[in-house]
Amino acid sequence: MARQPAKVEEMDAWVIRYVNKLKNMMGLSNWTIMMQAKPSSADALGETEVIHGQHLAKMYLHKDFRKDSPEDIRATIVHELLHCHLAVLEEAVHEVLKPDPDDAKSKAVHKMVISLIEYENERIIDSLAESMGKWMPVPDMPKVRVKKKAVKKVVKKQVRSKK
């Protein structure tokens, strides 16, 4: 039996519009942000892979992002877009401290410094996202449709007894 290819869903149009709006407001108008339908890691609200030299980023949101409040979605997307601005720091440090492949000590130092830079970058991005996010618009999310259940009304006739 032939395996069926996995069905790849497209990202919601309202999310793409919102990300494009925010990227322009955040000085990233010359960037291409590719919204990925595949969810981010289970322990993350979002993830972004940045290719700085190409002004390209792939953004992933967690699988249940549609259940988030507009404010939470705004916070996540502002945070992820800030990675586009700051990823160059990690890339520069990585290149400057590129370890000698035969030197275990330089590999260990490289790994430690990169981990420190990544950690501090996340803290900086968290702080910037929190302070500037409140000035950004919230997304125009589709209204949640409530399914109404058909209610069957039973009318009971009152029977009066004759006395």
Label every PLM stretch briefly.
Residues 2-71, 88-163:
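Metalloprotease/metallohydrolase-associated module, dominated by Zn2+-dependent proteases
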